[in-house]
Amino acid sequence: MTAALRIALIAPNRFPIRQPFAGGLEAHVWHLTRALVQQGHHVTLFAATGSDLAPQSAQLTVRALSRSAAAARPFPPPGAVVESDHRAYLDLMVELADRSVTGFDVIHNHSLHQLPIALAPRLRTPMLSTLHTPPFTWLESAIGTTAGSGRTYTAVSRHTAAAWGRVLDRVIVVPNGVDVHRWPAGAGGQ
C-alpha cells in the first residue's frame, strides 16, 4: 500500500454492525471495516447505533428523528421504504456533500437505500457501491437515473452482477468479504 485512504463506509442502518450478525450484509461490512483498518486505512462507518466499530475507526451517527403528526400517515406504503432510513440517509448524504471537498478520499456504499446512489453525482468524492441483492424497485430506479455518471459498481457474486445487467453495463465482481475461516459453509437453511 502506498498511502492510507480516508474511507467513508456506508452500511445498512437497520441493524447494528456487530456479532451476532443480523445477516450476511452486516457480516460483510464488519469484516471489510476491520480489514481496511488493518491495512492502515482510516475508516468512518455510517451504521446503526450499537455497531461494533473496528479499532481506530470513527462513526457517523444515525440521528433519531421524530415525526410530526402530519407525517404519521404511511407513504410510501409500509414495507417499501422505512421513513427513518430515508431521513438518516438524506442527512448522511448532505453531510458527505459538505465534507466532500476535503473529508474523504472515497465513499464505499453498502446500503440498500436509493438515496446514496441518487445523490452520489452531487458529491465531489468518488463513490463505489457494492450490490448485495438482486434489483428491487427503489434501488433499480436510482441506479437507472444515475447510470453513465461515472459511478463504479461491484457485486458480491456473478449471479448478483448478472441480475443488474439490464440497468448497468459494467459490474465488477468482488467475492463476498466474509471471512470463510470464521464462517464456513454449512448445511444450509430450510
What spans do the regions from the language model cover?
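Catalytic cores of nucleotide-sugar-dependent glycosyltransferases that transfer UDP/GDP/TDP-activated
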Residues: 1-190
